[in-house]
Regions:
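Condensing-enzyme catalytic core mediating Claisen C-C bond formation in acyl metabolism
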Residues: 1-49, 166-283, 289
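A glycine- and small-aliphatic-rich helix-loop capping segment at beta-alpha/alpha-beta transitions
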Residues: 90-105, 135-140, 165-170
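A short, small-residue-rich loop immediately preceding and capping a beta-strand
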Residues: 75-78, 145-155
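Membrane helical hairpin/interfacial module
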Residues: 71-95
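Conserved small/polar residues in nucleotide/adenosyl-binding loops
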Residues: 319-326
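Phosphate/pyrophosphate-binding loops at sites that engage ATP/ADP/AMP, CoA/4′-phosphopantetheine
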Residues: 59-74, 281-306
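Cysteine-centered functional microenvironments
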Residues: 44, 78, 111-129, 162-166, ...
Length: 327
């Protein structure tokens, strides 16, 4: 059986950026810690016309052009993101739409019609799940069917201004070409998995009553010096069902559901979660390798000593050696 893995990678970043040295001076932060400790040089910022879909589409387009791919040969485009544009349809459909507009003149209308697209969301690792799925799909087709898949990763990572996570903001996208006999990296079919249902980082939908919105607006009016009559908020709320604004999104229901792109998070708790997950994933990988007779702990060198590189999520950097030693 031929190997399956990463054949090529293309990246796209916005041209606008905030240099980390300037950010450190602006916030009074330690530039040495940000640059030398965490490897941060600049914070990419999407322009007004850029979002998750445009960044992903640019990366895929670069991958297609560089590898002279016929869109009809691409069986799937799976996107990993936590910055989706729509609550119903995959952001990958917007990427596909832009790609069709770009390539239809050369390859015909609907040149991506038979391409499967979907989004996968799991904080920072959604694209890993998308890649795992795509690797299995390509491998299952066999070398003769020559399946080609693209994994896209794109995000606009935002934090509240002045928050402890603000310096980790950024934006960008990338595309990974998955197929048989890869030029860059062959990926075996043993995966170590560790999933924990913890609340260290999430983007919940918040519920706000219309009454609260009206009362806050009136309070702002008073602060600005406007004269507000007694019980005005109550009168407005009673009048809304008969008003010309009754069907506006702000007033059509008694409560509003608000989604913010910035997360609720606990950085130190996240670090502990990352460390434990990496450790447990290594243990799971080791167990599976033993079951499939690819690793004998009594005769073989320990797994982590066999690998030339171990790549982990950045907050895991200081914890990796401890987790690996226990494996």
């Amino acid at each position: 059986m031929s190997e399956v893995g990463i054949d090529d990678i293309a990246l796209h970043f916005p041209r606008l950026f905030f240099a980390m040295q300037d950010f450190a001076e602006f916030r009074g932060a330690d530039y040495g810690k940000l640059n030398k400790g965490l490897g941060l040089e600049a914070m990419a910022i999407p322009d007004v016309h850029e979002d998750t879909a445009t960044m992903g589409a640019n990366a895929v387009s670069r991958l297609i052009d560089r590898n002279s791919l016929d869109p009809s040969s691409i069986g799937r485009i799976y996107l990993g993101t936590e910055s989706a544009l729509d609550g119903a349809k995959p952001t990958a459909t917007y990427i596909m739409d832009m790609l069709e507009q770009r390539y239809s003149a050369k390859f015909g209308d609907n040149c991506f019609r038979n391409c499967d697209v979907v989004d996968m969301t799991f904080a920072c690792i959604g694209a890993v799940d998308a890649m795992h799925n795509t690797l299995d799909w390509v491998a299952r087709g066999g070398e003769k069917r020559h399946r080609v898949g693209i994994v896209v990763f794109a995000d606009n990572a935002k934090y509240d201004l002045g928050s402890s996570g603000e310096y980790t903001q950024g934006a960008g996208g990338g595309a990974i070409l998955i197929r048989h006999n890869p030029r860059l990296l062959a990926i075996p079919d043993i995966w170590g998995v560790s999933t924990m249902p913890v609340h260290d980082f999430f983007k919940p939908r918040r519920e706000v009553e219309t009454r609260t919105v009206v009362e806050n607006v009136l309070e702002l009016a008073e602060e600005s010096g406007a004269s507000i009559t007694a019980n005005l908020a109550e009168r407005i709320l009673k009048f809304i069902p008969r008003s010309s604004k009754k069907n506006d999104v702000l007033f059509e229901n008694e409560k509003l559901m608000i989604h913010k792109d910035t997360p609720v998070f606990d950085g130190q708790f996240s670090n502990r979660c990352y460390s434990e997950s990496v450790k447990q994933a290594f243990i799971d990988f080791r167990s599976k390798a033993i079951v499939e007779e690819r690793y004998n702990p009594d005769e073989d060198e320990i797994l982590t000593n066999q690998w030339s590189r171990i790549i982990v999520h950045l907050p895991c950097l200081l914890y990796t050696s401890d987790a690996a030693d226990d494996t």
